[in-house]
C-alpha cells in the first residue's frame, strides 16, 4: 500500500522531511538561467528548462536523505504546456531516483470532473499521491478515494490549512457546535478506514498546517488513522515545537513539507555566508539535514521514537 511504502521510506531515510519543489524563475540562480536560455532561448521554453534544471539539482542533492518530494503544480501551470512538461519531467526524474512524488494539485469539483482529475494524476504512474480539496462535500472526493485504493496511491485532503485566512471558513462553528474543519476531519477519518495499511495508518491522509499547533493536537486525536502532510514549516512560520503533536509516540503520523526554506536555503541568513548561488543544491541538502536533526531531537525530547 502507498502508506506502508511511505512509512518504510521514512524509516529508511530516517527523516519525515518532504522537499517542496516550488521554483520561481526570479529566484533561480543566474548561472542556471544562462544555461537554459542558451539551450532553449530567452523565452517560455527557456524559463521552463531553467525550472527543471533547478529542480534536478535539488533532487540530486536530497534524494538519499528524504522519502518524498512534493511538486506544486501552480508553479508550472503558469507557463502553459511548457510548464506542464517541466512538471512531468521533474516528477519522472524524482521517481527515477527512488523518491515518492506527491502532486500538490488541491483538486476539488463535482464527481464527473473529479473523475477526470483523478485520471490525470492518480492513474499516472509518475505520482504516488495527490492533494485534494474536500470542502465541496464527500461525493466530490470519492473518485479520488476509489482510484487511490484501485491504483495503490494516496491522497491528502485539506483539513486545517496553514494560511492565515483558513480561519475565515474552517474555523466557523457549525450548528453542532464544532468547527467546520473538525467536521471535515471526522469525514476524512471515517473514509480513511477503507484503506488502512499494516502500520495502522491509511492511504487517505490529511493536510494539517504547522502554523496551527493547537488545532493539530486536536486533529491528531480525532484522526488516529490519518497520516498528516504538514505544510507551513519554515518560511510560513511553523517551528519544530509547532509540529510535534502531528506525530504519534512512535515518531510516525506526519511528513513535514518545506519548500522555500530548503530550495532557496542559500539565500537565507543562516546559510548565505556559507554557500554561493552555485552551491544552491548543497545548501538545500544542508538545510534538510539540519531540519531532520531538529525534528528528530524534538521527538526524542517528547520521549517519542525518532525516525
From Swiss-Prot:
Keywords: Decarboxylase, Lyase, Pyrimidine biosynthesis. It comes from the Bacteria. One of its GO terms (biological process) is 'de novo' pyrimidine nucleobase biosynthetic process. The active site is at 106 (proton donor). CDD domains: OMP_decarboxylase_like (cd04725). Pathway: Pyrimidine metabolism; UMP biosynthesis via de novo pathway; UMP from orotate: step 2/2. It holds the Pfam family OMPdecase. It catalyses: orotidine 5'-phosphate + H(+) = UMP + CO2. This is Orotidine 5'-phosphate decarboxylase. It comes from Thermoanaerobacter pseudethanolicus (strain ATCC 33223 / 39E) (Clostridium thermohydrosulfuricum). The gene is pyrF.
